[in-house]
Amino acid sequence: MSYVGHLVKSFTLWEFVKAHALTLKYFFKPKATINYPFEKNPLSPRFRGEHALRRYPNGEERCIACKLCEAVCPAQAITIEAEPRDDGSRRTTRYDIDMTKCIYCGFCQEACPVDAIVEGPNFEYATETREELLYDKAKLLANGDKWERAIAANLAADAPYR
């Protein structure tokens, strides 16, 4: 750049003008931010949130105590104990997830042959104590009951890719 061109740009504060033009360009566009927590963006069907155990429509638990989720968990956050039932099938007596260890990888959901353990749509589960992040079977089933409609819709939307 010539000395004269540099002098003209410096004298007219060309960079200052360009910066203000860019600011004015975006000033009148619609805002990209949302007013959280009063507004919420839609979540992807593949979103990995709070864990839940699902039930069949007749109310029976889906988990067949195969322990694949426990085996595949890289963080070793899942603990399962099972007993055989009178009809010969197995059901869980204890199903615990330590959410302080969980890395939300989704391997447990992928490994489950009956879609019993899923990661639901809830992402707001901050707690005041560490003990509240140790989910037992009752808490997981309650989550499943609470989010069943959303979970079923997300699994149906994701079905072509599974």
Swiss-Prot record:
One of its GO terms (molecular function) is NADH:ubiquinone reductase (non-electrogenic) activity. Pfam families: Fer4_7. It is found in: Cell inner membrane. GO terms for cellular component: plasma membrane. Binds 2 [4Fe-4S] clusters per subunit. [4Fe-4S] cluster 1 binds at residues 63, 66, 69, 112. GO terms for biological process: aerobic respiration. Residues 53-83, 93-122 form the 4Fe-4S ferredoxin-type domain. Keywords: 4Fe-4S, Cell inner membrane, Cell membrane, Iron, Iron-sulfur, Membrane, Metal-binding, NAD, Quinone, Repeat, Translocase, Ubiquinone. Gene3D superfamilies: 3.30.70.3270. [4Fe-4S] cluster 2 binds at residues 73, 102, 105, 108. Its cofactor is [4Fe-4S] cluster. PANTHER family: NADH DEHYDROGENASE [UBIQUINONE] IRON-SULFUR PROTEIN 8, MITOCHONDRIAL, NADH DEHYDROGENASE UBIQUINONE IRON-SULFUR PROTEIN 8, MITOCHONDRIAL. NDH-1 is composed of 14 different subunits. Subunits NuoA, H, J, K, L, M, N constitute the membrane sector of the complex. NCBIfam families: NuoI, PRK05888.1-4, PRK05888.1-5. HAMAP family: NDH1_NuoI. This is NADH-quinone oxidoreductase subunit I.
